[in-house]
Every structure is written in C-alpha cells, then in structure tokens.
C-alpha cells in the first residue's frame, strides 16, 4: 500500500523516485518524533533542510497529522504543562518559546488560557522561596546587600517570563517573609 499518490508521469523511474523520497521523508519525521513531540513547522523545517520538495513534505505532514502524530494544539498544551512545572516559566516566556517553534497565535492563546494570574503568582512565589533558602541574606540593615539580592531574584523571574511589577512585589514580600523566618 502506497501512502503517497503517484505523480502523473509517463516515466516509471521518476514515479519510483518520488515514492522513495516520500518514504524517506516519512522515516525522517518518524525518527524525529521518536525523540520528542514536534510541531508541524519544526518538521517542515527539518524536511526543507534536507532538501525534500514541498509537495512531498506537505503530503507526509498531512498524513502524519491525519493519523494524529502531529498535533500542534496537543504539543502546545504539553509544552506549557512541562515548562511551567519543570522550568518555572511564565506566560510570556512560554508564548515566546511556542512562537519560536512555529505554533499559531490562536493555539498559543488556547494553551495559555488555563494559566490564571493567581497560579502564575503562586509559582513565582515558590521559585523565589526556593532560591531564597539558598541565599545568604546578611545584615538586615545593609540596604545594598538587600537590593543586590532583590535585583538578582527579580532578574531570575524576568528571565523566566514573569511580569516585572509582579516579580518585584513577590520578591519584596518573600524577602520580608524569609527575614522573619530566619529571626526565629
């Protein structure tokens, strides 16, 4: 059974070559998908990089989408869940990562819709708390040392895609809580 329609040509050697290239493209996509889930755009780029014609790439990707091996919506949801849990990424960073992987904006919005501001703030507080436990705070009257720690923590949250205003509020509150905890 052939997964790809044979091109209308009178030369059977050319038709065999097209079928062979289609099978090679399919094998490449399956090998890439074995390592991790990928977006359609990532697979298109991999096929283009290896010189597969657009019509063969489109046929292979359409078939993989049809059987459910390529699903950008599912990929985006899994990516958001994984990166929030393991890397502590905020909405902004997650959206940028998904855009870079070629996911459509509507799909990104749908994947990020499940994250509310309260959950994002809670995750930021947890990240700051974990980091503060390993920080040496020094003298509470030394404002320079306190500002240095605060800048470092706000920067950490900013790199993970958290809003700067929220990051500053979280860091200020968690610094005060940690100082209070260490007094006891």
Curated annotation (Swiss-Prot):
Signal peptide (from-to): none
Annotated S-S bridges: none
Renumbered residue ranges of the record's region Disordered: 1-21
Subcellular location: Cytoplasm
Main location as per UniProt: cytoplasm
Domain of life: Bacteria
One record GO biological process: regulation of DNA repair
Database matches in Pfam families: RecX_HTH1, RecX_HTH2
GO cellular component, as recorded: cytoplasm
Keywords, ordered alphabetically: Cytoplasm
Sequence similarity: Belongs to the RecX family.
Function: Modulates RecA activity.
HAMAP family named among the record's database cross-references: RecX
Protein name: Regulatory protein RecX
Species this chain originates from: Mycolicibacterium vanbaalenii (strain DSM 7251 / JCM 13017 / BCRC 16820 / KCTC 9966 / NRRL B-24157 / PYR-1)
């Amino acid at each position: 059974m052939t997964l790809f329609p044979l091109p209308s040509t009178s030369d059977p050697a050319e038709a065999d070559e097209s079928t062979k290239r289609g099978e090679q493209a399919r094998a490449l996509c399956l090998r890439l998908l074995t390592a991790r889930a990928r977006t359609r755009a990532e697979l298109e780029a991999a096929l283009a990089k290896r010189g597969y014609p657009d019509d063969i790439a489109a046929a292979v990707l359409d078939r993989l989408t049809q059987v459910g091996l390529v699903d950008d919506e599912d990929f985006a949801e899994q990516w958001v869940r994984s990166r929030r849990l393991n890397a502590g990424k905020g909405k902004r960073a997650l959206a940028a990562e998904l855009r870079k992987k070629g996911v459509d904006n509507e799909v990104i919005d749908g994947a990020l819709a499940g994250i509310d501001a309260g959950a994002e703030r809670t995750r930021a507080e947890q990240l700051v708390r974990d980091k503060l436990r390993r920080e040496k705070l020094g003298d509470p009257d030394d404002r320079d040392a306190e500002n240095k720690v605060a800048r470092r923590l706000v920067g950490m949250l900013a790199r993970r895609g958290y809003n700067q205003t929220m990051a500053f509020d979280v860091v200020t509150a968690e610094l005060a809580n940690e100082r209070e905890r260490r007094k006891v």
